[in-house]
Amino acid sequence: MDDSLRVSILSEALPYIQSFSGRKIVVKYGGSIMEDEKLKKAFFRDIALLSSVGVCPVVIHGGGPEINRWLSKLEISPKFEKGLRVTDDKTMEIVEMVLMGRVNKQIVRGINKTGSLAVGISGLDGNLIQSRELGDGSHGLVGEVTQINPELLEPLIAKGYIPVISSIGSTTDGISHNINADFVAGELAAAINAEKLILLTDTPGILKERNNPNSLAKQINLKEARKFIEKNIVSNGMLPKTECCIRALAQGVRAAHIIDGRIEHSLLLEIFTNSGIGTMINA
């Protein structure tokens, strides 16, 4: 890279850095990026860079592949219905062990290695994520968010720490729930008055033509996002992600992004460049 290109990149990023300094950005970390060492390291550096220029990142994570590995080790067959993991008591124990004890700490360790300061917590800590049983209970201990109590996060963010949160919630009676990390991220973004919600996925973003990767919808508004759902342009796995973004925007988040986590440094490319890399939905 020659000097003029370096200067051009920095010049393009500067107004975004100035605009988002002091603002909170919630990032849902998941998908293939969690399985690829090179992508993981790039993600940790991206989060560290955001923090170093004054942005306040908050990371929400799932950990499906790691959960499946541990279920396999314990000779338990994973069960899914309508894309959601059926979670009985034994599976919930493993989900808690894996998300809180392994995946969360791996992310914290990775970010801390960059020189930034991450703090690992779960939705159980300080009743951060309160939940109830999802739907008719046919998925067992799968839950949905009823309330976010962000008081635990506020002093951490104010002191420059990066919260890393596992997507487990609980009822007022202390019953734990496994919750979709996308929806946790959306509800949390609204609760902490975040500037942005960013979902890292295994797709380029929202496609206008389902099987055409060149048909990426770069920037749409809330009304257009709803029309995409009505016209079945958005469906399958992209449907809950888009619904999550719509709900977050309706609750005051300024912008929501669905981006391809399989591209190295996609987070920085989306936030700090004019063209971005995925789909941005504006309120």
Swiss-Prot record:
Sorted alphabetically, the Gene Ontology BP terms of this entry are: arginine biosynthetic process via ornithine; L-arginine biosynthetic process
Pfam families (alphabetical): AA_kinase (PF00696)
Function text = Catalyzes the ATP-dependent phosphorylation of N-acetyl-L-glutamate.
Q: Which CDD domains match?
A: AAK_NAGK-C
EC assignment: 2.7.2.8
Enzyme kind, highest EC tier: transferase
| The keyword Translocase appears for this protein | no
HAMAP family, per the entry: ArgB
Pathway info? Amino-acid biosynthesis; L-arginine biosynthesis; N(2)-acetyl-L-ornithine from L-glutamate: step 2/4
InterPro entries tied to this protein: AceGlu_kinase-like_sf, AcgluKinase_fam, ArgB, Asp/Glu/Uridylate_kinase, NAGK-C
GO MF term set: acetylglutamate kinase activity; ATP binding
Which residues take part in binding substrate?
G63, G64, R85, N178
Q: Which reaction does it catalyse?
A: N-acetyl-L-glutamate + ATP = N-acetyl-L-glutamyl 5-phosphate + ADP
Compartment annotation:
Cytoplasm
What is the protein's given name? Acetylglutamate kinase
- The protein's site described by Transition state stabilizer is found at K28, K241
Family membership noted in the UniProt record? Belongs to the acetylglutamate kinase family. ArgB subfamily.
GO cellular component, as recorded:
cytoplasm
Which SUPFAM superfamilies does this entry report, sorted A to Z? Carbamate kinase-like
Q: Which UniProt keywords apply?
A: Amino-acid biosynthesis, Arginine biosynthesis, ATP-binding, Cytoplasm, Kinase, Nucleotide-binding, Transferase
Q: Does the keyword Kinase belong to this entry?
A: yes
Name the principal localization, coarsely classed.
Answer: cytoplasm
